[in-house]
Structure formats: structure tokens, C-alpha cells
């Protein structure tokens, strides 16, 4: 990865909080009832939505260009503690998110994986450091974070890094430039779940969104690299918008044409 481009403080965007009300969504799959829970805070700025027993999507509502925009990450419930994929817009939301999930699961957040150096991903880095939570990132993301005025994450992730948190296997992958120079994706091989982050657009997205730091001419190649590496995908979590499947990657390619 080249380290010569300064990212502007941009956003990918978010929705999260404290545990105040629970709504249950029922669906029938293979003649078996599956309960999926959504937990929100009082103000609706923070929510966590269940994908399966051990994987939840966290969503925070942040502000970008004067508009409220929801931003997604993950909560991984492992045998050794909780792991987040991305923090939130700022320290206030990140603190509230951490308190919310630690109360829900009765476990401590031990690690966070930062997928790039925009505010909606790394905005809570100060809170992470204050709480002794390990913030994993690529070296490029750490460098760009410092340039953008944030405290540095660890910079310990390579092009491909395989991690294990208790019973949870996690792979991080740098597919190339796209939404930013440093964007990575996160793969959960036990569930075939891909966290596309802001590299991947939701089906409701009509354009590429914030492209202040984008490499539009290289973005398609990076999406193709993800498709080549992960051929059996059950679910894709975009940086913003609804969870989908492999079709989100194909939709992103269409937007890039």
C-alpha cells in the first residue's frame, strides 16, 4: 500500500446507543422460526441488529453535510469477549455503544477493527484507547489517522491477516483502493459474512456517496478482488444501508460504470 495520500476527514456514516426497547422480527426459514432481535437506545441514535447468535450489526446515526446518516459496523460475541468492527462517529457515540453492548452481553469489548480512517469508522479512537481496547488497522490507516488528527490505531494488519478472538475466526483483507486509499473488508469464515464497509454500497444507494478521497478508477478492480477471494458469501454488511448478499458487490460495480 502506498502511504502518500492524505485523506480528508470524510465519512462513511452511523446509528447506535443504550438498551431501552427491543423489537423482535420473526421469519420462517426451512420451516423453522428464526427470531431476530433489534435493540435501540431511547433516542434512536444507536441500534444493534442480530444476524445470528454471535454476530450483530451496530448502527449509529451521525451527521454528514447537515443530514442524519446511519453507519454500520459489527459486534462479535466471542468466547473471550466482544469485538467490534469499526467504532462510531465520535467518542460520545462510541462510549454509549460500548456500554450498550457490554450490558447486553455481560462481556467486555476487548478489540476493534478499524476499516479506514474516516470519522464514521475511527471517530471513537480516543475512547478505545482510554478503555484499553486494542484498535487494529493497517499501517496506512494508522498513518492517515495521525494526519487527520486522530490518535493512531495499532497499524498491525497486513494485506491479508487472519485473527482469532476466542472461538471466532476473522480475516481482514485489503483489496485495493476504492472509497478511500486504505479501505479494508472483514470476513467471518465460520458464517461466510462479509463486512464490505464503505467499499460496498447498499441496494438503496443511487450513487457512490462521499467520493472526496475516492479512487473511482481503481474501485471496480478492488470489488473484483473481493469477489475472487470470497466466492461463497451468505451476507454482506455495507458501510451504510441495509444488509444484503453478493448482489451488493454487483450493485456497486454497476454504480461504477
Swiss-Prot record:
Cellular component GO terms, alphabetical: periplasmic space
Transmembrane segments: none
Cofactor section: Zn(2+)
Activity regulation statement: Inhibited by captopril stereoisomers and iodoacetate. Also inhibited by chelating agents such as EDTA.
Disulfide bridge positions per record: none
Family that this chain belongs to: Belongs to the metallo-beta-lactamase superfamily. Class-B beta-lactamase family.
Protein name: Metallo-beta-lactamase type 2
Source species of the chain: Bacillus cereus
